[in-house]
Design a protein with these regions (language model features):
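An N-terminal, well-structured beta->alpha segment
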Residues: 10-108, 197-234, 245
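Short, glycine-/Ser/Thr-/acidic-enriched flexible segments
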Residues: 21, 54-56, 61-63, 98, ...
């Protein structure tokens, strides 16, 4: 698969026949075997890794979000990190409530681990700002958030952050894009068993300790705490996390700084990958 990119039909057959790809992917591809337009759309190009990372429809194919395109992007990031001499610092990983987000986070972590780069993975979904805090708190070289932000439910994405806690900017963005695009052979993409990675100290679950430190840091950012003390007891707040990641952390920080009357929209309280209340 190295060298000039195959045509879409060759790519389709490669994914269908090569032992590298799992049976679930092959079954999905077999089901579209008679749909030439769908095959072309899934394979006519590689899912673009841009300045914001990856974003695309979930499914099998080179132009889709799946474990293989996530691994490929992560291999490119790992190659860049190693060239920068940052592999000892590790990478923090968070994910949202979308379909496949936990799986994609794990695949990214295990690719990093296979490259000798420690992954710090949140135990459950977390908001993007906490990822920015975590990677700085842990002294990581980079961070990854599995999210597609405002896109429809059938989408997911992969955002890359650097050691300052912000999304990658010039010139690093283009340098990382180059490394990702240089990964042309899926067989060169590394991965490893999760238990093996954990035993080797290359996969660490993070959670409450980071949450607590994040909350304390948020409290330091309050500009007028005296005003909050005056109004918090009587003020009523209506909040909606829109079925995403904000429910627990937002309610926690509001409670801890004194707001007692916080009402969450019940239909949009729990994580929902289908975002069924939103048009």
């Amino acid at each position: 698969m190295e060298g000039k990119r195959m045509g879409y039909k060759e790519q389709y057959n490669f994914w269908l026949e090569d032992s590298y790809f799992d049976e679930a992917v092959k079954k999905e591809l077999q089901e579209i075997g008679g749909d030439e337009k769908e095959i072309e759309d899934r394979f006519y190009k590689d899912l673009a890794f841009g300045t914001g990372g990856l974003r695309g429809v979930i499914g099998a194919g080179t132009n889709r979000m799946n474990i293989y395109t996530v691994r490929k992007a992560t291999q490119g990031l790992a190659n860049y990190i190693k060239k920068q001499g940052g592999e000892a610092k590790g990478v923090a990983i968070a994910y949202d409530s979308r379909r496949k987000s936990p799986e994609f986070a794990d695949e990214a972590a295990l690719c990093l681990a296979a490259n000798g780069i420690k992954a710090y993975v949140f135990e459950s979904l977390r908001p993007t700002p906490e990822l920015s805090f975590a990677l700085r708190e842990l002294g990581c070289i980079s961070g990854i958030v599995i999210t597609a932000s405002h896109n429809p439910p059938e989408y997911n994405g992969y955002k890359c952050y650097w050691e300052d806690g912000a999304q990658v900017t010039a010139p690093k963005d283009k340098e990382i894009i180059t490394e990702v695009n240089n990964v042309t052979d899926y067989h060169t993409v590394k991965t490893m068993d999760k238990t093996e990675a954990m035993n080797a100290g290359l996969y660490q679950v993070i959670g409450k300790e980071i949450d607590d430190k994040y909350m304390e840091e948020l409290k330091k950012q309050i500009i007028h705490p005296e005003i909050i003390k005056e109004v918090a007891k009587d003020m009523k707040i209506v909040y909606s996390p829109f079925n995403g990641t904000g429910n627990l952390p937002v309610r926690r920080i509001l409670r801890e700084i004194g707001f007692e009357n916080v009402y969450v929209v019940p239909e949009q309280e729990m994580p929902d990958p289908d975002f069924t209340t939103l048009d």
